[in-house]
């Protein structure tokens, strides 16, 4: 039985965000690096750096937190895994869902790599819906 690396990084980021931690360390694979690049480009995380420990590569993510002293702390990251190893979810480019009217993003795995819903619509290709982020 294999590991679901995408679910692992989503859970790590969600737990760190709820615990108000600023830094998260996740295992580095090709898939996680591509997903993290999308999160960085879309502004959901502040910084990424690669770290090696005992011949294993890790990604160290710096999360973006919105702090307001008048109101209580609010999580800014909502992540949901959609397609999973036991139930794969595929969509063509016309049926890719819009999250919060385009505010959130859908991350897809396509034949041209991992990309956001906007990029997939522009290139007119569908794929496996990996996760929603809003």
UniProtKB/Swiss-Prot annotation:
Keyword Kinase part of the UniProt annotation: no
SUPFAM superfamilies: Ribosomal protein S8 (SSF56047)
TM ranges: none
Stored InterPro entries: Ribosomal_uS8, Ribosomal_uS8_CS, Ribosomal_uS8_sf
Biological process, per Gene Ontology: translation
Known role: One of the primary rRNA binding proteins, it binds directly to 16S rRNA central domain where it helps coordinate assembly of the platform of the 30S subunit.
PANTHER family: 40S RIBOSOMAL PROTEIN S15A
NCBIfam families: PRK00136.1
Listed name of the protein: Small ribosomal subunit protein uS8c
Species of provenance: Panax ginseng
Gene assigned in the entry: rps8
């Amino acid at each position: 039985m294999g590991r679901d690396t995408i679910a692992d990084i989503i859970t790590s980021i969600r737990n760190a965000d709820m615990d108000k931690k600023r830094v998260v360390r996740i295992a580095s694979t090709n898939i996680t690096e591509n997903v993290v690049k999308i999160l960085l480009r879309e502004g959901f995380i502040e910084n990424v750096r690669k770290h090696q420990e005992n011949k294993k590569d890790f990604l160290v993510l710096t999360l973006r937190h919105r702090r307001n002293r008048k109101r209580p702390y609010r999580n800014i990251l909502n992540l949901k895994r959609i397609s999973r190893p036991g139930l794969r979810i595929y969509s063509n480019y016309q049926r890719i869902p819009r999250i919060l009217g385009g505010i959130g993003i859908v991350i897809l795995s396509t034949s041209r790599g991992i990309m956001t819903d906007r990029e997939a619509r522009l290139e007119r290709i569908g794929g496996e819906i990996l996760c929603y982020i809003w």
